[in-house]
Amino acid sequence: MKVKVGINGYGTIGKRVAYAVTRQDDMKLIGVTKTKPDFEAYRAKELGIPVYAAGEEFLPRFENAGFEVAGTLSDLLEKVDVIVDATPGGMGAKNKAVYEKAGVKAIFQGGEKASTAEVSFVAQANYEKALGKDYVRVVSCNTTGLIRTLSAVQEYIDYVYAVMIRRAADPNDIKHGPINAIKPSVTVPSHHGPDVQTVIPINIETSAFVVPTTIMHVHSIMVELKKPLEAKDVIDIFENTTRVLLFEKEKGFESTAQLIEFARDLHREWNNLYEIAVWKESISVRGNRLFYIQAVHQESDVVPENIDAIRAMFEMADKWESIRKTNQSLGILK
Amino acid sequence: MKVKVGINGYGTIGKRVAYAVTRQDDMKLIGVTKTKPDFEAYRAKELGIPVYAAGEEFLPRFENAGFEVAGTLSDLLEKVDVIVDATPGGMGAKNKAVYEKAGVKAIFQGGEKASTAEVSFVAQANYEKALGKDYVRVVSCNTTGLIRTLSAVQEYIDYVYAVMIRRAADPNDIKHGPINAIKPSVTVPSHHGPDVQTVIPINIETSAFVVPTTIMHVHSIMVELKKPLEAKDVIDIFENTTRVLLFEKEKGFESTAQLIEFARDLHREWNNLYEIAVWKESISVRGNRLFYIQAVHQESDVVPENIDAIRAMFEMADKWESIRKTNQSLGILK
Amino acid sequence: MKVKVGINGYGTIGKRVAYAVTRQDDMKLIGVTKTKPDFEAYRAKELGIPVYAAGEEFLPRFENAGFEVAGTLSDLLEKVDVIVDATPGGMGAKNKAVYEKAGVKAIFQGGEKASTAEVSFVAQANYEKALGKDYVRVVSCNTTGLIRTLSAVQEYIDYVYAVMIRRAADPNDIKHGPINAIKPSVTVPSHHGPDVQTVIPINIETSAFVVPTTIMHVHSIMVELKKPLEAKDVIDIFENTTRVLLFEKEKGFESTAQLIEFARDLHREWNNLYEIAVWKESISVRGNRLFYIQAVHQESDVVPENIDAIRAMFEMADKWESIRKTNQSLGILK
Amino acid sequence: MKVKVGINGYGTIGKRVAYAVTRQDDMKLIGVTKTKPDFEAYRAKELGIPVYAAGEEFLPRFENAGFEVAGTLSDLLEKVDVIVDATPGGMGAKNKAVYEKAGVKAIFQGGEKASTAEVSFVAQANYEKALGKDYVRVVSCNTTGLIRTLSAVQEYIDYVYAVMIRRAADPNDIKHGPINAIKPSVTVPSHHGPDVQTVIPINIETSAFVVPTTIMHVHSIMVELKKPLEAKDVIDIFENTTRVLLFEKEKGFESTAQLIEFARDLHREWNNLYEIAVWKESISVRGNRLFYIQAVHQESDVVPENIDAIRAMFEMADKWESIRKTNQSLGILK
């Protein structure tokens, strides 16, 4: 028996999760919702994915364009075991009542508050916490990135200070700026530290900045250690951490541009770089402080988490079995 | 018997042509050259592609990195029937003597002068001119884009004025600016008009501007017609023109960003958009003037031309057979 | 007697016009309006300019911040002879009824429709048309730029095709993108041609593109001539045209960045470049076609027009006297 | 008697220092050097500043352009008491021998190694160290920014970790990228920490990133305190620190764009923001850690330091007298 999955919202995250679902042997994609018949909707149809209107209010748009939908969100909810809410931040909380009423489990994304779900989730950090749950929140791309590497060195952490340099808009988003400025979150520490703490109990503070780029976030991480650790140990640890990859500037990885080029060279779908990219040369320890720099592909790093969350919620596999299946199906390198 | 192909230069164009060669049933990729052992070189090796040093002077770099090469360019030249020169603009002309001495045919890219080769080439416009030739130049990405659409309406053209708004650097190139300025080619008309004339004999003048974007060029084209033509005729013509696609703003194609997203949604390798993208709504005729706007994916539009040029040079197929084979092998939509 | 001037909207255009008014010996700045007490409002106060709330609904914002205003827009209207409406595009039309009721003359900006005012205005092209009028529209930055140079060669024009490459946002605007894309106006010809025709009766068609830069627009202009003209004649004409300056790439003016640097080197307030910048080397004539490239500083080129419009509306000076006074007071080079 | 000052290199820094010299009542600008007759050279001439060729090898360029120079660098050196070396990074060290031979004192910029000069200099931190010296290095824009604020809280500092988000190119520089990427300095800690230590003896580590913007650098600073300090104390301290200004997001200072707009609104020459801009809301203390965010106008923050350095080298004024004179002459707010 395959778990029947619906996706509410077929944008940057939704379409990637939909694709990932189709790559699993224990899941079936039932349908996706759209608010308008744009090229992404046509592409879904071309792929044979049933497209539902995200609400009755959107039906006229589809009718006017002659785009036949399979129904509305409520129709979709009747057919699925779980809905992945990939709507814009804050809407998931509003949708929750609808999912509850329909009696379907739901996964929310990091744009929702932690309180929207029973557990906040990063597979390699707390898979077990989501076992059997009805409502799970996959944390944001940045938080996922922090947790992937920090959970790997968690036992050494006394305190973390992370500075996040964030892309201002996704490649497909032409509405948002800035075009030529740096915009700080002036409230320091920023909200990302507490968000990490919804998954792993570490002492962490962060600050965040928006810069005019579209392709990846970058994190400058400093860890105050509570027991000795050398740079080569950290390299070993990260080499053995799933969904974390080391990249060398010496091989030409000078910026986020070459990391994306790496994903393109692999012919990854949408140049997804599901793995967190750590610059190997940046890993250093001075006294009791560990430093490293990592980059996060905001469009895709949470995709495997959504798949693993489904398995945990239906208790379909244990942690490492799920991670292994997800990794293998998506071509995640390790 | 398959034609044995080498690629001199495994960068933006070279790696795409190499990939395209591996997709042909009548060609065999013998090897590629690199000047340094960067991640692209490692990727080639992973793919089982023999990597040669682009010259003896580069051997120490590979040796120091412990990267084993299959030889140097001269070794590669001994094994191939044709070399695709994908070196930086201007270097091809210098390399020509080496190719001549080795007795191999050669394809040059648009960064070289027309006089470097016997013929300048765009498959759908002048395939036959390259039949049996030893030296063929595939024209630049911009010139290819102009010729694809203009050759389709060639009989109607009295005069063309095209304004090219060019991306300043490729996605993988972080060296070049500008970051926040528009840079005109102050010599008007620019060199692109005469370059078009190396392939089709039309009356054309152009101007060109560099702007801070990495993903696509855009052309604003105005054609003075010598006989009547309506917008709907042009739509028909372009719908029946190979390697040209119509995109509608109404479906969400508001900018070059969504065109690239379309290629990503198709899971095209490196988000290649081999086809020239014409905005359907932009096609209009007022009096004796036709207007339209098109976008060019500078990283990939010349790739199919390189493949077709090989077939023409070895007289392996006639024009439409070659175009059909190339299109099918690369997933080109029409 | 000085004309009493109020400014409704103290943003990019409003603050520059306010400054310009203070530089005139025949005008008096009575006050400006703001919707919120931001740093621009504080700066106005520092300069001794009375600040009014743009409406009663905005008063609480000022009160909460402890920022004392001099009243609201209606109070300001009681004290002025003319109001310069520098509100966001489209709001001017709505404000007109208020101005009419208050019995004050009004100047609108290019974001309003031509029908909002009795005349659309560029001083050097049609100053006389505005004499004694109550409602005048200063056309947009792009339209002003086109008219400054085209009116200088008007008698030679058979047809104009202009391509506008537009900055996506002003330097102070961090909300708007795109960050990495080119966005065409897919309706060709664009609305700019008809807008030019509200001032000068020439045959003109245009297309327009938005690109990720903040500092200047650039226009690529092609004129089909109805009588012979040589490039050197055009250079002579432009050298004798007010508010048009020739710049040479040879002297380092390679892009819009160096044009702004020129204004900064002059210590112009806000690096205003009131003059339209034409690249001298770009001026060329081939057959019956004239080509040239110009750049427009969108933040400031319409400022002198607002001043001249005031003089025309109150019949304070004839055309060349007003232009001379305005130029001299603002340091316009010619 | 006024000190006679020459400027070697009339680019971004050189032209600003030249201007600043002309604003001092105890200095006289003798001349500046250029390598080519570009618009900056013409502007210097317009301002009545003698222009010298930066070397004999550059004379033909000036001759060909009909630009009359006042001589070469060696002629200039004969006439001055001190030369401000504002040549590109690394050239100053090479020029030092020439200055020594000519027997003139010299100021170097932060692109040179500390060992090039006798002392590295930030006026408010170590003015006295430069008294009577022959060779002084004004540290880089970023290092100056760090020292201005950190020296004000120096007695509280146990350890500093600063992350620098750097503009990729100056507004006038269209050669350098990246256009759409973030580029880390992968060697962590970066060289900026040791550079701070050439001026003040604090325990500091840094990391650095280049992002696609041209207008300002931003620093995210975390200080581990060795004695208690509250946010309001830090606000008090910074309010009383020269060349440091507090800006509030609440007043509209959301990004670096509005900081530059502030300087433009002041009609500062070249929109210079000589002062370091600290976001008031960002100042916070949590436990023993102080956080704050600041921005640095890379084109101008070192200009007052160059002026103060001259006074120190000739023992023309004591520290606070010099700072006061420099501030007043340049309109520095405090």
UniProtKB/Swiss-Prot annotation, chains A, B, C, D:
It comes from Thermococcus onnurineus (strain NA1). It is found in: Cytoplasm. NCBIfam families: GAPDH-II_archae (TIGR01546), PRK04207.1 (NF003251). This is Glyceraldehyde-3-phosphate dehydrogenase. It catalyses: D-glyceraldehyde 3-phosphate + phosphate + NADP(+) = (2R)-3-phospho-glyceroyl phosphate + NADPH + H(+); D-glyceraldehyde 3-phosphate + phosphate + NAD(+) = (2R)-3-phospho-glyceroyl phosphate + NADH + H(+). Belongs to the glyceraldehyde-3-phosphate dehydrogenase family. InterPro entries: DapB_N, GlycerAld/Erythrose_P_DH, GlycerAld_3-P_DH_AS, GlycerAld_3-P_DH_cat, GlycerAld_3-P_DH_NAD(P)-bd, Glyceraldehyde-3-P_DH_2_arc, NAD(P)-bd_dom_sf. Its main location: cytoplasm. SUPFAM superfamilies: Glyceraldehyde-3-phosphate dehydrogenase-like, C-terminal domain (SSF55347), NAD(P)-binding Rossmann-fold domains (SSF51735). GO terms for molecular function: 4-hydroxy-tetrahydrodipicolinate reductase; glyceraldehyde-3-phosphate dehydrogenase (NAD+) (phosphorylating) activity; glyceraldehyde-3-phosphate dehydrogenase (NADP+) (phosphorylating) activity; NAD binding; NADP binding. One of its GO terms (cellular component) is cytoplasm. D-glyceraldehyde 3-phosphate binds at S140, C141, N142, H192, G193. Pathway: Carbohydrate degradation; glycolysis; pyruvate from D-glyceraldehyde 3-phosphate: step 1/5. Disulfide bonds: none annotated. Its EC number is 1.2.1.59. The gene is gap. Homotetramer. It comes from the Archaea. Keywords: Cytoplasm, Glycolysis, NAD, NADP, Oxidoreductase. It holds the Pfam family Gp_dh_C.
